[in-house]
Amino acid sequence: MDTAQPAMTAPPAQAAADEPVGRVTAVRGAVIDVAFDTGALPMIEDALVITTDDGQPIIAEVQAHLDEGTVRALALRSTNGLRRGAPVRAAGGPIEVPVGEAMLGRLIDVSGVPGDNGTPLPPGTPRRPIHRKPPPLASQGAETRIFATGIKVIDLLTPLAQGGKAAMFGGAGVGKTVLVMELIHAMVERYQGISVFAGVGERCREGHEMLTDMRHSGVLPRTVLVYGQMNEPPGARWRVPLTALTVAEYFRDERHQNVLLLMDNVFRFVQAGAEVSGLLGRLPSRVGYQPTLATEVAGLQERIVSVGDVSVTAIEAVYVPADDFTDPAVTAIAAHVDSMVVLSRSMAAEGMYPAIDPIASSSVLLDPLVVGGEHARIAIEVRRAVEHYRELQDVISLLGVEELGADDRRIVGRARRLQRFLTQPFAVTEAFTGVPGRSVPVADTLAGCKAILDGNCDDWQESSLYMVGTLDEAREREQATRNAKPVSEHAEP
């Protein structure tokens, strides 16, 4: 496979003869200066192929024209061993990556080179440039369809749109990656579509675990994995979301298939852009981010659209540094999404998984015209009950729940039961917990929440509602608990 890499990353042979040839004049980490003595300079965002002594080409992307004969480029792999004077060939266009059916079940890097020790890609595999304009506005789909996930708290409070963008915001260790994995599982179970996963700046161990899990679960044959991991240069982490999006666009445009695009983690894309900006000598903006932060985020997000009746649905994990939701990177990403799923560290500490905050999370789809009046009403009542409970928590911690009025005690009891009912075991965690995953239809979620709000479960143990699927399952658990109690406990005092 190694011998095939230069051919995969090089431009078409017939164009190579006319492309300018240059030489490396300076190497500063991932930043390379290249001089071209003759011919026109490569354009901004064009690819360069640099020949190295070990025979493995380095792909770089032009970022600036320094003078009439020199460009500054950003390397997409390590420049260790690169020397001044190394020959450089301009590719004549942006980086192109392989797309199509041959990519299903494969793991590739930012330049499209397979990294799964599999067979080489077949000759004639189509290629597309990673820099593309969004589809014309007139061709973009405007119909709103709900993307049912089977996850109760998401379907109830932050419904996702098929063809829309949803982001999962949370700090370290609150369950973002597990939630993304469960959504991949839901896509395979519920929708006959393609999944494209972009691993952006995450740990190599997590990437290997995901590849292994997908092989064992049977998900891999309908999935493309695109990795730019934590140990790779910032240029690779900066461009890998565009590679994944290009693969997804091909299935949407040419194969007319619905695509689920998952990115973990979009914050690392922004972080890599900040590194690149610093390497290129640009003045930083707020909190040290690149001055082009909003432009870079928009350039990625505005390409994620539906065309006609074929959709690209994006689910993005977003790391929140120091749990600060006012961070410029977080706010820039949030401006582009339809649904904000906020993961709470305090809920994770209480074991309320998925640790989704029902108050801070929101969705533009939670509208009676989209989800229906009954759904919207139940969601509002659930939020109102949980919010009232939170307002009383300080009083409860100081004086105890017994000091509350009868109405407040009733609301607190129902809010606690709602919080527990909205937890559920996931299929992707079954190997660790031993509890089979549950996928719950929206109708069952609404029926369960309505019953709790109406007081039908006021005399139930809270534990009966914890980590279940439907209310029927909770009812069986409650009945089993009551049957297991000694007779004396049932007797009147």
Swiss-Prot record:
SUPFAM superfamilies: C-terminal domain of alpha and beta subunits of F1 ATP synthase (SSF47917), N-terminal domain of alpha and beta subunits of F1 ATP synthase (SSF50615), P-loop containing nucleoside triphosphate hydrolases (SSF52540)
Enzyme superclass (EC): translocase
Gene, per the UniProt record: atpD3
Annotated protein name in UniProt: ATP synthase subunit beta 3
Pfam family, one: ATP-synt_ab_N
Alphabetized InterPro entries for the sequence: AAA+_ATPase, ATP-synt_VA_C, ATP_synth_F1_bsu, ATPase_a/bsu_AS, ATPase_alpha/beta_chains, ATPase_F1/V1/A1_a/bsu_N, ATPase_F1/V1/A1_a/bsu_N_sf, ATPase_F1/V1/A1_a/bsu_nucl-bd
Membrane association type: Peripheral membrane protein
The keyword Cytoplasm is annotated on this UniProt entry: no
Lineage, uppermost ranks: Bacteria, Pseudomonadati, Pseudomonadota, Betaproteobacteria, Burkholderiales
PROSITE patterns associated with the record: ATPASE_ALPHA_BETA
Assigned protein family: Belongs to the ATPase alpha/beta chains family.
Entry binding sites for ATP: 170-177
Keyword annotations: ATP synthesis, ATP-binding, Cell inner membrane, Cell membrane, CF(1), Hydrogen ion transport, Ion transport, Membrane, Nucleotide-binding, Translocase, Transport
Function noted in UniProt: Produces ATP from ADP in the presence of a proton gradient across the membrane. The catalytic sites are hosted primarily by the beta subunits.
Complex formation: F-type ATPases have 2 components, CF(1) - the catalytic core - and CF(0) - the membrane proton channel. CF(1) has five subunits: alpha(3), beta(3), gamma(1), delta(1), epsilon(1). CF(0) has three main subunits: a(1), b(2) and c(9-12). The alpha and beta chains form an alternating ring which encloses part of the gamma chain. CF(1) is attached to CF(0) by a central stalk formed by the gamma and epsilon chains, while a peripheral stalk is formed by the delta and b chains.
Region called Disordered, residue ranges: 113-138
Species this chain originates from: Paraburkholderia xenovorans (strain LB400)
EC number: 7.1.2.2
Entry GO terms, CC: plasma membrane; proton-transporting ATP synthase complex
Gene Ontology terms, MF aspect: ATP binding; ATP hydrolysis activity; proton-transporting ATP synthase activity, rotational mechanism
Subcellular location(s) per record: Cell inner membrane
Catalytic activity: ATP + H2O + 4 H(+)(in) = ADP + phosphate + 5 H(+)(out)
